[in-house]
From Swiss-Prot:
Mg(2+) binds at residues 191, 193-194. Belongs to the RuBisCO large chain family. Type I subfamily. The keyword Amino-acid biosynthesis does not apply. The record marks 324 as: Transition state stabilizer. Its main location: plastid. It comes from the Eukaryota. It comes from Onoclea sensibilis (Sensitive fern). GO terms for molecular function: magnesium ion binding; monooxygenase activity; ribulose-bisphosphate carboxylase activity. This is Ribulose bisphosphate carboxylase large chain. The disulfide bond which can form in the large chain dimeric partners within the hexadecamer appears to be associated with oxidative stress and protein turnover. The gene is rbcL. InterPro entries: RuBisCO, RuBisCo_large_chain_AS, RuBisCO_lsu_C, RuBisCO_lsu_C_sf, RuBisCO_lsu_fd_N, RuBisCO_lsu_N_sf, RuBisCO_lsuI. Keywords: Calvin cycle, Carbon dioxide fixation, Chloroplast, Disulfide bond, Lyase, Magnesium, Metal-binding, Methylation, Monooxygenase, Oxidoreductase, Photorespiration, Photosynthesis, Plastid.
Length: 440
């Protein structure tokens, strides 16, 4: 009997506006710009097909499975207001298309191939809805916000951090000295920069040893628990886990990973190790702007944030709204909520296309970092709230009197702003005066 081969319009199979989404479906919102002459329905169906079961023609093995059960479906298309030939395509994927507990497989399927499709001029993944049936198969953050606060014995305020500068070139001993000065001045954390791994001028083992000495010395002086994000990122997973194990042996409370350059498989492996061994895990998003900065092509950071929450991390950098790096306030607060909260309602004004229910998955602390200083403290305290890490690099180390006075200035400003907020004062209007009063 045979079958009819040849090129076939995707919309005949994969555009299904009558489809009612299931609670177990993974839902995606794509911003797509079709090539001239390509109908929106065909473009949306092509996205659904190429990111699930489809290819450009009918193949005889289609008859050996149930396409209706496994195919992705473009179930809605809406034009983007104010944009010519740009649409939001909504696609539903059956849960059985994806391996449990694997962000790697999730992204390989949904964004691995379709972005090079010739029928599309541009394509951007704006949001994903992860159903509880799938999110419950992931490790999630190794510890989460509440457990971290309990480990550190620090409550009722944001945590303070600092990235050690210059990021490259210091010897291990001088690096440890810079860490000590910041921590004794009142910071909770210091941090390896994302590209500090194990270079000729400072091998990782030497850095870990001198930083551990700085941690214990500053803890003894201040009576507070201190931490330094020891970057365990390495060229292999085995080496990464070896570095994390050495940090644990030294008694360090937290390690760090560059999750996009290191990869989701490595990140999830490290998250399991951290949970099993009592280490907190700080996540840096190096390389994110390559993926998320273009407004019409790539992937929005809220998707990368959701992926990180599933893959595993206790902190992640999330922009500042007020600093040197790009970030719109409402959109930034939208993905901050997606990192911290259990249940987040759909809110298109904040870029949230789907209601997201994380059930019991622990939250991730957003880290505000990049071009911020002490005079941003009132705005940061108001924008990010208590469950956050405010990280000042140059804003600490750039103090004319040195690292420790820079750390003192940040701690004094933070405590002044938190107290004023708790007393009901208006930080937006009185913030600078509040800091001046406290610093006299």
């Amino acid at each position: 009997v045979g079958f009819k081969a040849g090129v076939r319009d995707y919309r005949l199979t994969y555009y299904t506006p009558e489809y009612k989404t299931k609670d177990t479906d993974i839902l995606a919102a794509f911003r797509m710009t079709p090539q001239p002459g390509v109908p929106a329905e065909e473009a949306g169906a092509a996205v659904a097909a190429e990111s699930s079961t489809g290819t450009w023609t009918t193949v005889w093995t289609d008859g050996l499975t149930s396409l209706d059960r496994y195919k992705g479906r473009c179930y809605d298309i809406e034009p983007v207001a104010g944009e010519e030939n740009q649409y939001i395509a909504y696609v539903a994927y059956p849960l059985d298309l994806f391996e449990e507990g694997s962000v790697t497989n999730l992204f390989t399927s949904i964004v691995g191939n379709v972005f090079g499709f010739k029928a599309l001029r541009a394509l951007r993944l704006e949001d994903l809805r992860i159903p509880p049936a799938y999110s419950k198969t992931f490790i999630g953050p190794p510890h989460g916000i509440q457990v971290e606060r309990d480990k550190l014995n620090k409550y009722g305020r944001p945590l303070l951090g600092c990235t050690i500068k210059p990021k490259l070139g210091l010897s291990a001993k001088n690096y440890g000295r810079a860490v000590y000065e910041c921590l004794r001045g009142g910071l909770d954390f210091t941090k390896d920069d994302e590209n500090v791994n194990s270079q000729p001028f400072m091998r990782w083992r030497d850095r870990f040893l001198f930083v551990a000495e700085a941690l214990f010395k500053s803890q003894a002086e201040t009576g507070e628990i201190k931490g330094h994000y020891l970057n365990a990122t390495a060229g292999t997973c085995e080496e990464m886990l070896k570095r994390a194990a050495f940090a644990r042996e030294l008694g360090a409370p937290i390690v760090m990973h560059d999750y996009l350059t290191g990869g989701f498989t490595a990140n999830t492996s490290l998250a399991f190790y951290c949970r099993d061994n009592g280490l907190l895990l700080h996540i840096h998003r190096a390389m994110h702007a390559v993926i998320d900065r273009q407004r019409n092509h790539g992937m929005h950071f809220r998707v990368l944030a959701k992926a990180l929450r599933m893959s595993g991390g206790d902190h992640i950098h999330a922009g500042t709204v007020v600093g040197k790096l790009e970030g719109e306030r409402e959109v930034t607060l939208g993905f901050v909520d997606l990192l911290r909260d259990d249940y987040i309602e759909k809110d298109r004004s904040r870029g949230i296309y789907f209601t997201q229910d994380w059930v019991s998955m622990p939250g991730v602390l957003p880290v505000a970092s990049g071009g911020i200083h002490v005079w941003h403290m009132p705005a940061l305290t108001e924008i990010f709230g208590d469950d956050s890490v405010l990280q000042f690099g140059g804003g600490t180390l750039g103090h004319p009197w040195g690292n420790a006075p820079g750390a003192v200035a940040n701690r004094v400003a933070l405590e002044a702003c938190v107290q004023a907020r708790n007393e009901g004062r208006d930080l937006a209007r009185e913030g600078n005066e509040i800091i001046r009063e406290r610093s006299k």
